[in-house]
Amino acid sequence: MSLHDYLLKEYGPSDRKKKSKKVDSKSTAQKPNNEDVNSNANNPLRDNSEKSLWLSHGVNNIPGAPLSDNLTNKQKNGINIEPPSRTVLEPKTHNIETVFRNAQGHKIDVEAKTLDSDSGKRNSQEERIRILNMGEIQLAGLDGVSTISSKYTAEIRDNDPATEFDHNKGVNHQKISPLGRKLYAGTATENRFGILPGNKWDGVDRSNGYEKKWFKRQGELAESKIQEFTNSEDY
């Protein structure tokens, strides 16, 4: 006996029976009863009511619903089409600092303002403590500063240009040149040209003495003329 005949004898008949049983079970399961077909034909609404609507995971549509040509072609090709999902973007309010702005639109640094206010309070407190720890003489000196400053501000000075705007204040009249320049108000030695010194002259004569000698000689000549005239005889 060959090996082929042995295997066919031992294993062949049992496999054929199992295959035939499987085929018979499938055929019996696929054949519908005539009674069920007739009942479904008589009640057309029964089929629609008993169907459960469910979405296919791969295609994302309702089975049995009519599809357009484009969708059916794309599904046949293996392309899954999903509608665009609308996601609502919620504003991220966590860990966001509030921005403060002034009337011009510039950002206001709140921390810097608080630091400035704290430093100002600290400085004012230190100044108050310093004044409290002062002696009577130092406090009297502080009071005198304001009185002295008010005295100087109330005083009217001749060289103040702002006095020209207020005509009600009593200002000492000062000599003014034809060109509008202020002249020296005190006494000064004259010169042969008749030029007066400026208002800022300190009164010190810094010339070489020629003007003084010239005026002295002019006086001597005038006196000699007078003497000659008086000593002359009348005829």
Curated annotation (Swiss-Prot):
Residues 1-52, 64-85 are annotated as: Disordered. Residues 1-15 have a biased composition (Basic and acidic residues). Residues 28-46, 69-78 have a biased composition (Polar residues). GO terms for biological process: maintenance of RNA location; mRNA splicing, via spliceosome. Associated with the spliceosome. Belongs to the CWC26 family. This is Pre-mRNA-splicing factor CWC26. It comes from Candida glabrata (strain ATCC 2001 / BCRC 20586 / JCM 3761 / NBRC 0622 / NRRL Y-65 / CBS 138) (Yeast).
